[in-house]
């Protein structure tokens, strides 16, 4: 939605080879996404890689008496991903090649208090990719789920900024290597694998006690 920022990135990217296209759209709008995808395919003469990076954070508004906050997270992070990527699949099938990428999260493995909508949205897109993978492989279409921890971007706000973070530039360079390497699901940074291991082995009672002590209010 932030056209000015897109145009600034496009201007900086002119220093590199290739042609830059910028479009403004709402990923919750399936019709807009389809129109833009078809426009890009026509202008770029195909599609090699589509990355669904648009997303939002925030807490569930658990005690607000309304589902508007959690619904916005779910609609953006799940429906936004399918809206963004599915219009490209027929062309990739026709080409018999392509790569689809979703930005999941370490939160898809760790149930964070007050952030059930965010965590479940990231589980959902990871599971969607896992289910798509066998069907798309026969058309040489790769599916890559990247599960980052805290990355230093504007989406990370409030108490969440007290956690160790990786710079956006460093993360972006790593993501490129992950995509080129054809990884299926990749947790980054790798030290989060230990946290995921603890979630799996700790008794639920102990895990919930730790979560209540660490996260007694929303972190973002």
What do the predicted segments below correspond to?
Residues 105:
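Residue(s) in the substrate-gating loop at a strand-loop-helix junction
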Residues 145, 160-196:
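C-terminal helical subdomain
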């Amino acid at each position: 939605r932030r056209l000015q920022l897109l145009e600034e990135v496009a201007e900086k990217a002119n220093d590199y080879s290739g042609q830059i296209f910028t479009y403004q759209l709402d990923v919750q709008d399936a019709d807009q996404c389809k129109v833009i995808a078809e426009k890009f395919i026509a202008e770029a003469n195909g599609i090699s890689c589509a990355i669904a990076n648009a997303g939002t954070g925030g807490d569930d508004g658990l005690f607000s008496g309304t589902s508007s906050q959690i619904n916005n997270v779910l609609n953006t992070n799940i429906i936004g991903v399918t809206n963004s990527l599915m219009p490209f699949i027929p062309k990739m099938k026709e080409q018999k090649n392509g790569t689809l990428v979703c930005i999941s999260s370490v939160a898809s493995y760790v149930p964070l208090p007050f952030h059930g909508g965010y965590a479940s949205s990231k589980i959902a897109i990871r599971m969607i990719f896992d289910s798509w993978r066998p069907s798309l492989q026969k058309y040489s279409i790769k599916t890559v789920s990247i599960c980052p921890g805290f990355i230093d971007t504007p989406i990370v706000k409030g108490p969440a900024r007290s956690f160790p973070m990786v710079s956006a530039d460093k993360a972006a360079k790593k993501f490129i290597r992950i995509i080129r390497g054809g990884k299926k699901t990749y947790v980054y940074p790798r030290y989060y694998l230990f946290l995921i291991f603890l979630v799996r082995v700790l008794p639920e009672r102990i895990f919930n006690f730790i979560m209540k002590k660490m996260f007694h209010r929303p972190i973002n």
